[in-house]
Every structure is written in structure tokens, then in C-alpha cells.
């Protein structure tokens, strides 16, 4: 299953650059040309940031006490109810928060990005009690099933969360 996901991500990133693709046949002025890069070319930290942005989206004032890309406002922080962060402010806050989660799981080396992405969404308390962390601590790298099991909301399996876990696993897990 893991190999199938990795193959899917690789194929998806290649399709946009194929010569027979309709998008590659249209003429685009030089000033508008942008090089398409695969997410897999980016460092793990940047991959995680893009994935979190895609699934969290920029929160609006009605989502209080969440601001930016899913940051939960803590007592003593200067954010006020009804505030809307700019893209730049939200990005900076996301990077700061995600860096803290990466620091929590620093001792897990290359797995810290995957664990930090899960902690950003579920909270470090959930991750610290999870079978994912237990398996990694025991040296077992077969964590696909355990990782993708974190896709429930209010007791029910949530398709969007499953998609998020599959995307995170495909982009951030290094065998």
C-alpha cells in the first residue's frame, strides 16, 4: 500500500510536465512562465508546511479560537476575537508552531516531521500515547496502518482526514 501511494504521488507530479499534456502545449509568455516543481523536491519541513496549509486553510474570524492555519489561541496571546491574520502573518505563525512540534520530536530524527504534522493536527498528547510513537520507539518502521488510523472525528471515520493522513505519509515518511 505504501509503495502504491508513493507511486501515485510520483505519477501525479510527473503528469503536469509530460509533453503530451494539454497544459504543456499552450503558448505562455516568458514573463508568465513558472517552473512546476514537485512537492517531493522540497525539504521535509517545507513539504509539511504546504500540506498543513492545504488542509487547514486560512481560518476566518468565525473560527475563533483558531486563527491563521489552525493555531489555537492560548491565554495571554495578543490575538483578539474577530481578528483576521494576513497570509504572511498566518504563514509565520504556522512555521513557529510547527517548529515547536518538530523540536518535541527531535530525537526521532527523520520521523520528526511526520510526528510533528500529526501533533499539529491532533495535539502532542494524542501523539505521545499513539501506537505510531510506540512502534517507532520499538524500532518498527511499519507504521502505515497506525498512522492512517488517526482519521476519526467525533467517533466516525472522516474522508478528509484520511486523505490528509495519506498525503502526509506519502510526502513525509522516509523508509
Each predicted region: which residue ranges?
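Positively charged n-region of N-terminal signal peptides that target proteins for export
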Residues: 1-4
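Bacterial N-terminal signal peptides
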Residues: 8-14
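C-terminal segment of classical bacterial N-terminal signal peptides
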Residues: 14-21
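Alpha-helical scaffolds flanking conserved acidic
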Residues: 45-49, 109-117
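Short alpha-helix boundary/capping elements
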Residues: 120-124
Amino acid at each position: 500500500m505504501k509503495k502504491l501511494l508513493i507511486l501515485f504521488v510520483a505519477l501525479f507530479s510527473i503528469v503536469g510536465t509530460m509533453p503530451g499534456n494539454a497544459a504543456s502545449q499552450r503558448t505562455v509568455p516568458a514573463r508568465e512562465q513558472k517552473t512546476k516543481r514537485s512537492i517531493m523536491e522540497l525539504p521535509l519541513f517545507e513539504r509539511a508546511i504546504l500540506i498543513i496549509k492545504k488542509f487547514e486553510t486560512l481560518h476566518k474570524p468565525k473560527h475563533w479560537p483558531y486563527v491563521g492555519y489552525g493555531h489555537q489561541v492560548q491565554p495571554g496571546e495578543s490575538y483578539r476575537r474577530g481578528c483576521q491574520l494576513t497570509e504572511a502573518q498566518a504563514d509565520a505563525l504556522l512555521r513557529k508552531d510547527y517548529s515547536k512540534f518538530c523540536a518535541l520530536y527531535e530525537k526521532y530524527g527523520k520521523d520528526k516531521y511526520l510526528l510533528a504534522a500529526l501533533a499539529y493536527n491532533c495535539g502532542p498528547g494524542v501523539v505521545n500515547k499513539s501506537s505510531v510513537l510506540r512502534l517507532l520507539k520499538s524500532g518498527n518502521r511499519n507504521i502505515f496502518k497506525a498512522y492512517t488510523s488517526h482519521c476519526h472525528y467525533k467517533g466516525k471515520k472522516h474522508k478528509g482526514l484520511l486523505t490528509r493522513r495519506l498525503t502526509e505519509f506519502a510526502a513525509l515518511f522516509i523508509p
